[in-house]
């Protein structure tokens, strides 16, 4: 997992 990984930010915003 990259640094700053968050369970709420698993994908880039569309």
UniProtKB/Swiss-Prot annotation:
Described purpose of this protein according to its UniProt entry: Induces smooth muscle contraction. May target bradykinin receptors (BDKRB).
GO biological process, one term: vasodilation
Alphabetical keyword list: Amphibian defense peptide, G-protein coupled receptor impairing toxin, Secreted, Toxin, Vasoactive, Vasodilator
Family under the similarity heading: Belongs to the bradykinin-related peptide family.
Secreted in keyword set: yes
Localisation: Secreted
Any one GO CC term of the record: extracellular region
Tissue: Expressed by the skin glands.
Keyword Secreted: yes
Entry protein name: Bradykinin-like peptide 3
A single GO molecular function term of this UniProt record: toxin activity
């Amino acid at each position: 997992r990259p640094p700053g990984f968050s369970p709420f930010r698993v994908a880039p915003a569309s």
